[in-house]
Amino acid sequence: MPDGIVNLGYGAFEECSSLKSINIPQGITTIESNVFSGCSSLENINIPDNVTSIKENAFRGCMKFQEIKIPETVSSIGNWAFSSCVAIKEINWPDKVKNINDYMFDGCKQLRKVNFPKDLKSIGDSAFGE
């Protein structure tokens, strides 16, 4: 994607099942709802350090993700953001995000390691459910 892009709208790449890799431009500060939802072949994504928010369902159903590197600049992540990402094995949780919302990692059957921040406040309904 060109570096000049400053907005990825709701569902911009939703269900792009052949998409394998993407670099999010530096101008993006929010990953909107459903932007990459259902991108079942997406393996690699580079989230830039200036992203502060990941909305609900942003990566839901990205079944090839094995590891997600969430920048420390992120302060909020919506419900179901990574649900049904069945291959995720490890998550590095940013210190600024104090809540793991409802269904955040629902269906992430391979998840083995989550690095929680010291001051995590809450874990929502079925956050790690099946």
Regions found by a protein language model. Give the residues of each.
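Structural signature of tandem-repeat unit edges
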Residues: 1-7, 17-30, 40-53, 63-76, ...
